[in-house]
Amino acid sequence: DVGKFK
């Protein structure tokens, strides 16, 4: 996952 891009 990539923090704010979810």
Swiss-Prot record:
Keywords per UniProt: Cell wall, Secreted
Compartment(s): Secreted, Cell wall
Cellular component GO terms, alphabetical: extracellular region
Protein name per its UniProtKB record: 60 kDa cell wall protein
Organism: Arabidopsis thaliana (Mouse-ear cress)
